[in-house]
Swiss-Prot record:
Pfam families: DUF444. It comes from the Bacteria. SUPFAM superfamilies: vWA-like. It comes from Clostridium botulinum (strain Eklund 17B / Type B). InterPro entries: Spore_YhbH, UPF0229, vWFA_dom_sf. This is UPF0229 protein CLL_A3091.
């Protein structure tokens, strides 16, 4: 016969705080992904430090509880695609009050705001954005994220680095010391329970070591002509700024070059690129040709992974269209990837996005259209998502 012992008074309660923290982090990550378009397209994001804070709305975590139903008939069934926390309703459900649709009578969700820094934002999206694989080039100089190696032990650390064997050894050593002390005092040491204590815990000490990778250069090219109004320019700068911040996190010493153009192209500093404005006509070819010259002078394709990215509203002087197409074909031959981002394009004329996609068949040519601010995040993912990694 089975014997059941009541040990409830001796049980250690489960730490619910750990589970709540995990669920809170999931809500934060979900909310960040849902609001990324608005955050990344903020004009104020450009030029901000890593400690710049952004507010994110998050639904509160409710405790599980049984509640009375509405005595409605039928059985609620799911579709198989539900996620944890989703409600399965039977029949139609009255909508909650929404703007311009009258007042509702349903209980709403509790929403509060939390703040994250720009640096934390980059950390959240780093799992989804990945630079295409860097080919092994000659004379590697770029240092990527450091890799950690175990170098000894320490008394404080995080749980994943807990050294279990060393912890047990520390406990045994303490137990033996106490055993000797009790024997000297003439006490019975066998009756004493001997649980683990905080002082027994040992953690691996991890030393970060830099890891070398292949050379990589990002060349940012922006149309600064008169057709690029302030909204388009802010959107382009936000696009490039987030891209540069992410890549600087992933590759510590990655090289960046900045070019902006009207009918003529100029190489500028990072500060000028993100803050200076010009006006004039548009020769798209001028920016591409300047990038090709830059590559010839400083970045041999045999030694460097080259990623030019160009942003424009797609308007170009018609006599320059053929030269622009030929320039893009040429730069594709010497680059690992060439990205073309078209911002808030005109709906009245056929833009360069359609001309490029019709005439350019190179596999390393990637084009995206940003028709509104919320498209910015999807454009970034398309340009750099993991599926674009080269074989």
């Amino acid at each position: 016969m089975a014997i059941f012992r009541d040990r409830t008074d001796k049980q250690v309660d489960h730490d619910r705080a750990i589970e709540d923290k995990r669920r809170h982090r999931q809500l934060v990550e979900k909310s960040i992904k849902e609001n990324l378009g608005d955050i990344l397209s903020e004009e104020s994001i450009v030029g901000q430090s890593k400690n710049k804070k952004f507010k994110i709305p998050i639904k509160s975590i409710k405790e599980y509880q049984f509640v009375y139903g509405k005595n409605s008939k039928g059985v609620a069934t799911g579709t198989g695609e539900e996620k944890r926390g989703d409600k399965i309703e039977s029949g139609s459900k009255k909508a909650m009050g929404k703007g311009n649709k009258g007042a509702g009578n349903e209980e709403g969700d509790e929403i509060y705001e939390t703040e994250i820094t720009l640096d934390e934002l980059m950390e959240y999206i780093s799992d989804e954005l990945n630079l295409p694989n860097l080919d092994e080039k000659k004379y590697s100089e770029i240092i990527t994220d450091s890799c950690g190696k175990k170098k000894g032990y320490q008394r404080h650390g995080i749980r994943p680095r807990l050294a279990k064997k060393r912890t047990v050894m520390a406990k045994i050593s303490r137990k033996q010391s106490k055993k000797r002390a009790l024997i000297e005092e003439g006490k019975d040491y066998k009756t004493e329970r001997f649980p683990f204590r905080e002082e027994d815990l040992r953690y691996y000490k991890v030393k970060m070591q830099p890891k070398k990778a292949s050379n990589a250069v990002m060349i940012f090219i922006m149309d600064a002509s008169g057709s690029m109004d302030s909204t388009k320019k802010y959107l382009a700068r936000s696009y490039f700024f987030v891209l540069s911040r992410f890549l600087k996190r992933k590759y510590n010493n990655i090289a960046f070059e900045f070019i902006y153009h009207t009918t003529i192209a100029k190489r500028v500093s990072e500060y000028e690129f993100f803050h200076k404005s010009e006006s004039g006509g548009t020769y798209i070819s001028s920016g591409i040709v300047e990038a090709i010259k830059l590559i010839d002078e400083k970045y041999p394709p045999s030694e460097w992974n080259i990623y030019p990215v160009y942003a424009s509203d797609g308007d170009n002087w018609s006599e320059d269209n053929v030269k622009a197409i030929e320039s893009v074909k040429e730069i594709c031959k010497i680059s690992n990837m060439f990205g073309y981002a078209e911002l808030l394009p005109s709906t009245y004329t056929q833009t360069m996005y359609y001309k490029f996609n019709k005439e350019i068949n190179e596999k390393n040519f990637i084009s995206v259209v940003i028709k509104e601010k919320k498209d910015l995040w999807e454009a970034l993912k398309t340009m750099l998502k993991q599926e674009l990694k080269e074989d």
